[in-house]
């Protein structure tokens, strides 16, 4: 019985690795040789070629075609730069969050649930989309001080919101996780 379960578990793991094109690596942050730079740039201004991430609920404005996942560029949004917040840089291309209460995208682009990005290609764009989602949620949920209720201000030196009244400082959360695989000999039981 245990040997049969081990075979099934190992087969499922192999199928997942093949389905995700991961070659055995199914981690979304495996984007080598690309590199994501998340240093805060307070004076960054989006270029026409900068990537734009815009969310409507849990859905991201994007396009998926035969060449994979694509994000719109700044050139597709005619309004002012004040609506854009710098997020990070991925191999020379800057990514900006478009803060818009009434999301509307350029023609040919649609909103897709963020859960699909786990298996989308190219992997580095999918990772950028998920990373942008985490920062989008942090900005959305970090508008008022948890101590005194005062509206927060963005710090000029680092990615931090601070309270001008009581001095409270709020940084993006890091949620560590542990990844476990249950094995029996050479078989993967629980991936």
Q: Model regions: which residues?
A:
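Short, positively charged and aromatic/hydrophobic N-terminal segments
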Residues: 3, 7-11, 16-18, 37
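N-terminal alpha-helical interaction blocks
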Residues: 13, 21-122
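Short basic alpha-helical hairpin corresponding to helix-turn-helix/winged-helix-like nucleic-acid-binding
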Residues: 124-133
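Short, flexible, mixed-charge glycine/proline-rich loop motifs
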Residues: 132-140, 152-157
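Short cysteine-rich clusters marking metal-coordination/redox-active sites
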Residues: 145-148, 163
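Non-catalytic linker/capping segments at the edges of enzyme domains
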Residues: 146-147, 154, 178
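Short functional micro-motifs and their immediate structural scaffolds
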Residues: 150-153, 171
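N-terminal strand-loop-strand
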Residues: 157-191
């Amino acid at each position: 019985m245990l040997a049969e379960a081990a075979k099934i578990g190992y087969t499922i793991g192999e199928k997942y690795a093949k389905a995700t094109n991961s070659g055995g690596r199914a981690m979304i942050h495996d984007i080598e040789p690309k590199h994501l730079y998340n240093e805060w740039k307070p004076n960054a201004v989006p270029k026409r070629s900068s990537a734009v991430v815009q969310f409507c609920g849990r859905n991201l404005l994007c396009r998926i075609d035969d060449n994979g996942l694509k994000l719109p560029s700044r050139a597709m949004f005619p309004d002012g730069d004040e609506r854009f917040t710098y997020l990070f840089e991925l191999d020379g291309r800057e990514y900006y969050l478009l803060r818009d209460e009434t999301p509307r995208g350029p023609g040919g682009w649609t909103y897709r649930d963020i859960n699909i990005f786990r298996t989308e290609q190219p992997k580095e764009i999918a990772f950028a989309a998920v990373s942008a989602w985490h920062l989008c949620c942090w900005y959305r949920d970090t508008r008022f001080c948890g101590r005194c209720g005062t509206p927060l201000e963005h710090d000029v030196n680092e990615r931090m919101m601070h309270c001008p009244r009581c001095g409270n400082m709020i940084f993006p959360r890091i949620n560590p996780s542990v990844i476990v695989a249950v094995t029996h000999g050479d078989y993967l039981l629980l991936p």
